[in-house]
Amino acid sequence: MKIFGTDGVRGRAGVKLTPMFVMRLGIAAGLYFKKHSKTDKILIGKDTRKSGYMVENALVSALTSIGYNVIQIGPMPTPAIAFLTEDMRCDAGIMISASHNPFEDNGIKFFNSYGYKLKEEEERAIEEIFHNEELLHSSYKVGESVGNAKRIDDVIGRYIVHLKHSFPKHLNLQSLRIVLDTANGAAYKVAPVVFSELGADVLVINDEPNGCNINEQCGALHPNQLSQEVKKYRADLGFAFDGDADRLVVVDNLGNIVHGDKLLGVLGVYQKSKNALSSQAIVATNMSNLALKEYLKSQDLELKHCTIGDKFVSECMQLNKANFGGEQSGHIIFSDYAKTGDGLVCALQVSALVLESKLASSVALNPFELYPQSLVNLDIQKKLPLESLKGYSALLKELDKLEIRHLIRYSGTENKLRILLEAKDEKLLELKMQELKEFFEGHLC
């Protein structure tokens, strides 16, 4: 049975993520990390979901039972776990979060000792241990060999200092008015402190988590409230994070939501202008707009494509010796400062770009026009092999004939089918998207 999806393990808390399941997974992961253990320490953080306590306690029980010493740091962004795992010399880091999903869901993401997400072969190795009853039941420690657990509440300061170091030393934010939407999630403590200490005039919204309101009509998936607040507050910029703050959505001074591909393009060129790129390659996923590739080419930069998922972006960056890349959804990686997508690092770089451009953000963050694109996330009941659906191949051939770029895939974390179409003719695009929706609703819903 496959346990891992595209971003760790995710599911409904108490349904898939039961205490017994989590304990078993924790033991399996711990035994895998033991093979390369240097410190016998594992770091655990979480977002603000109510079920995080249940999942955390199950993981602590599992890991201490096989001899690991566990450091619990409470609600922190996913990229903070990646950073602190390496910074505190731990064998591994674990983030308890379902990212942008509703509060009823939860998830578990693993990081190696260098702060990188696990590769697929590492996940498969953990799955093999998970299904090995004999190995699991023969691994418990007794007496003094049992591990301990301790909670540390002040590591937030380390991450804040790290974030501030990512911001250019010759700049400050005193001339910027910024609205932050922390999605009642993991960034609710960190984000306001970082921007305030760098001098910004800050307004914070959705920063009162109660365990059940994470991502609820707020944050990166619902930036309309942020857009309204930016206009009302006459702010220069607005930043919306998702539940675990590895994703960023930017709103300009006019209240417009900045497209992720425009963000990738303008940030890539900004990094080049500072001689901060390690290569001429910038990494993006197959969902990126063709206009991004053309824009980067005009700036003597090369776009490298990879599979969807920020861990695949990271792997492709390493392969191409690149230090900048991301997804149009807002997972953007500056690998000089973060091994995974970090919404706060990205927000600081956007702020620096706007400051140095001496332009309004609505101008500075709008470097090129996009080709018409349509993205639909279709709720489905079943995940059948797409190639097995009668008429599917003919549909794709027709799209190719009409020169409509297409990317159709199942979500790795939810019961959704993601359909992306791109073409120069917007009306044709809308027509074909409706046809595709009706086709898949008839076969998968």
From Swiss-Prot:
Modified residues (Phosphoserine): S99
Keyword Isomerase part of the UniProt annotation: yes
EC number: 5.4.2.10
Reactions mediated catalytically: alpha-D-glucosamine 1-phosphate = D-glucosamine 6-phosphate
Modification note: Activated by phosphorylation.
Cofactor binding, note field: Binds 1 Mg(2+) ion per subunit.
Positions contributing to Mg(2+) binding: S99, D242, D244, D246
Keywords carried by this UniProt record: Isomerase, Magnesium, Metal-binding, Phosphoprotein
GO biological process: carbohydrate metabolic process; peptidoglycan biosynthetic process; UDP-N-acetylglucosamine biosynthetic process
Presence of keyword Cell cycle: no
Gene Ontology CC terms: cytosol
InterPro entries the UniProt entry points to: A-D-PHexomutase_a/b/a-I, A-D-PHexomutase_a/b/a-I/II/III, A-D-PHexomutase_a/b/a-II, A-D-PHexomutase_a/b/a-III, A-D-PHexomutase_C, A-D-PHexomutase_C_sf, A-D-PHexomutase_CS, Alpha-D-phosphohexomutase_SF
Required co-factors: Mg(2+)
Family per similarity comment: Belongs to the phosphohexose mutase family.
Name of the protein: Phosphoglucosamine mutase
Organism: Helicobacter acinonychis (strain Sheeba)
Lineage: Bacteria, Pseudomonadati, Campylobacterota, Epsilonproteobacteria, Campylobacterales
Gene name of the encoded protein: glmM
